[in-house]
């Protein structure tokens, strides 16, 4: 029978008589008390026999019901005539009480003990505002006493932890905090930590604390702290185990000390020394990072080489002495011994008989005695003869020189001293009497070699060009070149003779550097070809201009990677144009469609109504990674209505224009001016854009704050130039050399974080240590420069050095680290160069000095390869050797395919001027020609020989 039934049944009878019984006891006690003290209170002198209220010796304790087992509540009081339990405000039935009565021998008072059982069902059926509770009520003849309330709850422990500990990887001596929230239970579970199934005693290890809200804290991690940690929760019902958390304590590698510098690897001259260090202090453990930096350092060393002495030439013999001997001497000065070198071996003085043995001391033969006058006369005759010979030779040299000048094809110099150093590298080739005429550096041993160095361009016009085309073969000795013969000492040092060029005077040949002459060729009222630049767009842009004529030239936008090459002859004779080029730095007018992105700046060249007779070359930088075929790249042009239309795909075949895609730039051959741009459509998620990442820093208004700005822009020079310009206005300084980041088109975002900030010198403002940029914002970063700002604060004004790492990484992609090590004081900061200086000077170069290949050499190359050849030695092989293997139909439509190929070569090599690559290509063609000659029939050889003679090849 349940507790409710007992309360309803037996409890009702108890309520009827228990109060009355208590009232009787109370009345009796009151009457006795009234007889002694007017009924107010018992006197203190009365013994505790029948005049004491019940005192509880044992009160009921809180209890928990485990599973279905009932619990017993007991209480004990003295003196007590009766004890009853009251649960949840209701009396417990008398039948449910079990009581015992004993006598306290020390006091002689009765001691009554009562207990009851409480079942799980009784507790579950109770629905009160508080827990199930019971208390004892004891009666004596003086009154009643109540015990404390004892709560009865059903014990349980849930299965699942509210929070399982998570595995951690921490550096050695770092802090480890493992969180554990045990399952809900009654009573609350106690937590114990296990390491590798062994209990952890925090009292025996001061480094471990398990008292903080069930968490495990290891203050300084040691290698021995690595292991599997388990949180154990237990109460009187059950035990529960959490998931194991693996803790790995790793050790980042540290460099050992540098070794001493090794000895120089060469005994003399320029060599190197090295020193090394190992990543063993400590060695990386448990997946710790390997040491950053180089394990080997090298420096150059220069040791003075010992120079052995060498004799000068012997001096002239001295005058014959009275002893019939004359002397000659030499000195050890060619060169003198230096740096411990050996002294010259041999005699420094030599003597011999000067009379062929006919000299007799004190008695000379009669025929050897000459008057003094005769000897003087012979000396005069000797010197007179030598003088006459010198004069004759000088007259002969002058006569030959004048004769050759009168017979030369060219009457005046068309290059000055400035042209000899006109900005391109020297072009060396050797001419041989026999061998392949196409080889720039023939492998055959010539019997006569003339070495020439072309140090400047040649300014030649059409009539002169025709004469040049009828000269001898391409690399035979040139009749229009005179060579200055230098001393044998210069030849021994390998210094090539400098060639001087002479040409006929021409009315349309202008001196170098006089570019202004082009603009003054026509009267001001007759200038239909000079365009006004006021019609240029007024948007934010970079712009450069130059005046060009028939000789052509090059227009360069400094530090942007954009350039324009006007070939020789592209502009008709006696015409000149003011050509401009600009880059849009505002909001791009080309709006991307779908997945298409802008890969280059919008470049405008003009004037748009200018007509050229030969395609010009426009170089536009781009930011696509073209090493893999994941892009579909298009060239687009803006129409007069402001719309963009596709000109061609880079991989398509076209005869209207030609695109050559290099890793960082696209070279386009065009015949009309306008606004052009490159767009790309990623074919797969592996398409990669090249981003340039850089960090700038500057002090803020608060003297303790320092601002870092991290930029991620397209890897084009003009995009970074815009960033540099903005930072200069804000007072920012470049803190680390920019680096390249490959950003995939996989839709994952970019994270930028600041790491390794000195903890006691600097602190970073909250919530700014790591910033995330959405993918679309980075993928279309050409709209405006993308940057994230970080604010650092110094603890004290005395801190002037800042060191930290900036990590730029794409989720599931590549990452780049910028190591900042700088002083925040501008006076102590090392300046980092923004751009190479090669574009910063001469934005407009006109005439021959703008080209790397001398014009005469260019004309002969074109004459050689434009003519079809039975052996395949034509312009197609020239294109192949210059890595031009596609869309050859474009060159076939040109009047001179070789000239267009060389124009493309000029555009690709505008910075390096690598004439060696062109020389190697021609040399390779020469070898192929030789191989074909060896396997051909004699008739074919003879025919080709006659053909070469007729065409001057």
UniProtKB/Swiss-Prot annotation:
Keywords associated with the record: Apoptosis, Cell membrane, Developmental protein, Disulfide bond, Glycoprotein, Immunoglobulin domain, Membrane, Receptor, Repeat, Signal, Transmembrane, Transmembrane helix
Cellular compartment(s): Cell membrane
Expression induction or repression: Up-regulated by p53/TP53 in response to DNA damage.
Residue span, Ig-like domain: 54-151
Topological category with respect to the lipid bilayer: Single-pass type I membrane protein
Key word Kinase present: no
UniProt GO MF annotations: netrin receptor activity
Presence of the UniProt keyword Repeat in the record: yes
Membrane topology, Cytoplasmic segments: 401-953
Region of interest (Important for interaction with FLRT2), ranges: 91-93
Processing and modification events after translation: Proteolytically cleaved by caspases during apoptosis. The cleavage does not take place when the receptor is associated with netrin ligand. Its cleavage by caspases is required to induce apoptosis.
Domain Death: 859-936
Glycosylation sites: 117, 228, 353, 376
Signal peptide: 1-32
SUPFAM superfamilies given in the database record: DEATH domain, Immunoglobulin, TSP-1 type 1 repeat
Site-annotated residues for Cleavage: 416-417
TM ranges: 380-400
Highest taxon listed in the record's lineage: Eukaryota
Subunit structure: Interacts (via extracellular domain) with FLRT2 (via extracellular domain); the interaction is direct. Interacts (via extracellular domain) with FLRT3 (via extracellular domain); the interaction is direct. Identified in a complex with FLRT3 and ADGRL3; does not interact with ADGRL3 by itself.
Family: Belongs to the unc-5 family.
Free-text function comment from the UniProt entry: Receptor for the netrin NTN4 that promotes neuronal cell survival. Plays a role in cell-cell adhesion and cell guidance. Receptor for netrin involved in cell migration. Plays a role in axon guidance by mediating axon repulsion of neuronal growth cones in the developing nervous system upon ligand binding. May play a role in apoptosis in response to DNA damage. It also acts as a dependence receptor required for apoptosis induction when not associated with netrin ligand. Mediates cell-cell adhesion via its interaction with FLRT3 on an adjacent cell.
Name used for this protein in its record: Netrin receptor UNC5D
Naturally occurring in which organism (per UniProt): Homo sapiens
Organism phylogeny: Eukaryota, Metazoa, Chordata, Craniata, Vertebrata
Gene: UNC5D
């Amino acid at each position: 029978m349940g507790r409710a039934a007992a309360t309803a049944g037996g409890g009702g009878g108890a309520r009827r008589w228990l109060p009355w019984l208590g009232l009787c006891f109370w009345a009796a006690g009151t009457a006795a008390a009234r007889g002694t003290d007017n009924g107010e209170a018992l006197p203190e002198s009365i013994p505790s026999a029948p005049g004491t209220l019940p005192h509880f010796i044992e009160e009921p304790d809180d209890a928990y019901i485990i599973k279905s087992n009932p619990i017993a509540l007991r209480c004990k009081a003295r003196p007590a005539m009766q004890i009853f339990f009251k649960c949840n405000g209701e009396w417990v039935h008398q039948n449910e009480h079990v009581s015992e009565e004993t006598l306290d021998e020390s006091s002689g008072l009765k001691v009554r003990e009562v207990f009851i059982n409480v079942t799980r069902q009784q507790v579950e059926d109770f629905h009160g505002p508080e827990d199930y509770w019971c208390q004892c009520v004891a009666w004596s003849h003086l009154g009643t006493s109540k015990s404390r309330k004892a709560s009865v709850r059903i014990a349980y422990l849930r299965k699942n932890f509210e929070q399982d500990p998570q595995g951690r990887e921490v550096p050695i001596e770092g802090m480890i905090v493992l969180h554990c929230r045990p399952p809900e239970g009654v009573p609350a579970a106690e937590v114990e930590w296990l390491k590798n199934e062994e209990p952890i005693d925090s009292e025996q290890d001061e480094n471990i604390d398990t008292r903080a809200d069930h968490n495990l804290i290891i203050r300084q991690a040691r290698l021995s702290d690595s292991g599997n940690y388990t949180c154990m929760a237990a109460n009187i019902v059950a035990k529960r185990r959490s998931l194991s958390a693996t803790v790995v304590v790793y050790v980042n590698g540290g460099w050992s000390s540098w070794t001493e510098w090794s000895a120089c690897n060469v005994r003399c001259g320029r060599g190197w020394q090295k020193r090394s260090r190992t990543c063993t202090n400590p060695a990386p453990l448990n997946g710790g990072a390997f040491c950053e930096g180089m394990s080997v350092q090298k420096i150059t060393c220069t040791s003075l080489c010992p120079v052995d002495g060498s004799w000068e030439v012997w001096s002239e013999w001295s005058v014959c002495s009275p002893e019939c001997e004359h002397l000659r001497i030499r000195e050890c000065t060619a060169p003198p011994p230096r740096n411990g070198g050996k002294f010259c071996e041999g005699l420094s003085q030599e003597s011999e008989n000067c009379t062929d043995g006919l000299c007799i001391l004190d008695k000379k033969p009669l025929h050897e005695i000459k008057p003094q006058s005769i000897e003087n006369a012979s000396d005069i005759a000797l010197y007179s003869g030598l003088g006459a010979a010198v004069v004759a030779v000088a007259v002969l040299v002058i006569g030959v020189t004048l004769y050759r000048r009168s017979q030369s094809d060219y009457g005046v110099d068309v290059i000055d001293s400035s042209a000899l150093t006109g900005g391109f590298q020297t072009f060396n080739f050797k001419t041989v009497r026999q061998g392949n005429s196409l080889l720039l550096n023939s492998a055959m041993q010539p019997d006569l070699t003339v070495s020439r160095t072309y140090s400047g361009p040649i300014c030649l016009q059409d009539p002169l060009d025709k004469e040049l085309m009828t000269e001898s073969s391409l690399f035979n000795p040139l009749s229009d070149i005179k060579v200055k013969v230098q001393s044998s000492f210069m030849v021994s040092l390998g210094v090539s003779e400098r060639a001087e060029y002479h040409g006929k005077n021409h009315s349309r040949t202008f001196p170098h550097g006089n570019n202004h002459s082009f603009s003054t060729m026509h009267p001001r009222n007759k200038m239909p070809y000079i365009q006004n630049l006021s019609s240029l767009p007024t948007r934010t842009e970079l712009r450069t201009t130059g005046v060009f004529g028939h000789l052509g030239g090059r227009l360069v936008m400094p530090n942007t990677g954009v350039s324009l090459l006007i070939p020789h002859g592209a502009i008709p004779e006696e015409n000149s144009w003011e050509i401009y080029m600009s880059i849009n730095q505002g909001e791009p007018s080309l709006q991307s469609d779908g997945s298409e992105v802008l890969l280059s700046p919008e470049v405008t060249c003009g004037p748009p109504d200018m007509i050229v007779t030969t395609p010009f070359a426009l170089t536009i930088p781009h930011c696509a990674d073209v090493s893999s075929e994941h892009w579909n790249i298009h060239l687009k042009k803006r129409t007069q209505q402001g719309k963009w239309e596709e000109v061609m795909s880079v991989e398509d075949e076209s005869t209207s224009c030609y695109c050559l895609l290099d890793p960082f730039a696209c070279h386009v051959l065009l015949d009309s001016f306008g606004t052009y741009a490159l767009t790309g459509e990623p074919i797969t998620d592996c398409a990669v854009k090249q981003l340039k990442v850089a960090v700038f820093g500057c002090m803020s208004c608060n003297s303790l704050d320092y601002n870092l700005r991290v930029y991620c822009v397209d890897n084009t020079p003009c995009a970074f130039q815009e960033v540099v310009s903005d930072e200069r206005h804000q007072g920012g300084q470049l803190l680390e050399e920019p680096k390249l980041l490959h950003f995939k088109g996989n839709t994952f975002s970019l994270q930028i974080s600041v790491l390794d900030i000195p903890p006691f010198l600097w602190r970073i403002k909250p919530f700014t240590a790591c910033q995330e940029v959405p993918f679309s914002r980075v993928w279309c970063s050409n709209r405006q420069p993308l940057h994230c700002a970080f604010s650092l604060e110094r603890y004290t004004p005395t801190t002037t050095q800042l060191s930290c790492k900036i990590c730029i990484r794409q989720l599931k992609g590549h990452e780049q680290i910028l190591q900042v090590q700088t002083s925040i004081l501008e006076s102590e900061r090392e300046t980092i160069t923004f751009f190479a200086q090669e574009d910063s000077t001469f934005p407009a170069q006109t005439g021959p000095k703008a080209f790397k290949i001398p014009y005469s050499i260019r004309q002969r190359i074109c004459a050689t390869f434009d003519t079809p050849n039975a052996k395949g030695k034509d312009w197609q092989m020239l294109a192949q050797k210059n890595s031009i293997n596609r869309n050859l139909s474009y060159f076939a439509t040109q009047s001179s395919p070789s000239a267009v190929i060389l124009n493309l070569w000029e555009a690709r090599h505008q910075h390096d001027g690598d004439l060696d690559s062109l020389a190697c290509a021609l040399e390779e063609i020469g070898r192929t020609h030789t191989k074909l000659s060896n396997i051909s029939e004699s008739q074919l050889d003879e025919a080709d020989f006659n053909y070469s003679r007729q065409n001057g090849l």
